């Protein structure tokens, strides 16, 4: 009977250890996925920022050109 108890406790202990290891790996994978998502969103933000900056420059140049033609026409 004592041998059976020890075996059951050993099986339960090993099961808990393996379960905790699996949970830890799962948390690590979730953290890695979150970091990848953060990196992708930062890249998208930088892309939009650069695109808007370029549009702003073009709009400024167009406005400056229009003002120069109006001043030159007078």
Curated annotation (Swiss-Prot):
TM region positions: none
A cellular-component GO term for this protein: extracellular region
Main location: secreted
Record localization: Secreted
Record key words, sorted: Amphibian defense peptide, Antibiotic, Antimicrobial, Cleavage on pair of basic residues, Secreted, Signal
Signal peptide: 1-22
Keyword Secreted appears in the UniProt entry: yes
Tissue specificity remark: Expressed by the skin glands.
UniProt cross-references to Pfam families, sorted A to Z: DD_K, FSAP_sig_propep
Propeptide: 23-43
GO biological process: defense response to bacterium
Function summary: Possesses a potent antimicrobial activity against Gram-positive and Gram-negative bacteria. Probably acts by disturbing membrane functions with its amphipathic structure.
Annotated family: Belongs to the frog skin active peptide (FSAP) family. Dermaseptin subfamily.
Record protein name field: Dermaseptin-B3
Species this protein is from: Phyllomedusa bicolor (Two-colored leaf frog)
Organism phylogeny: Eukaryota, Metazoa, Chordata, Craniata, Vertebrata
């Amino acid at each position: 009977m004592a041998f059976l108890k020890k075996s059951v406790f050993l099986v339960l202990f090993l099961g808990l250890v393996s379960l905790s290891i699996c949970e830890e790996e799962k948390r690590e994978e979730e953290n890695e996925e979150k970091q990848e998502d953060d990196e992708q969103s930062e890249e998208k933000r930088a892309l939009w920022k650069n695109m808007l900056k370029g549009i702003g420059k073009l709009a400024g140049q167009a406005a400056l050109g229009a003002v120069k033609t109006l001043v030159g026409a007078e």
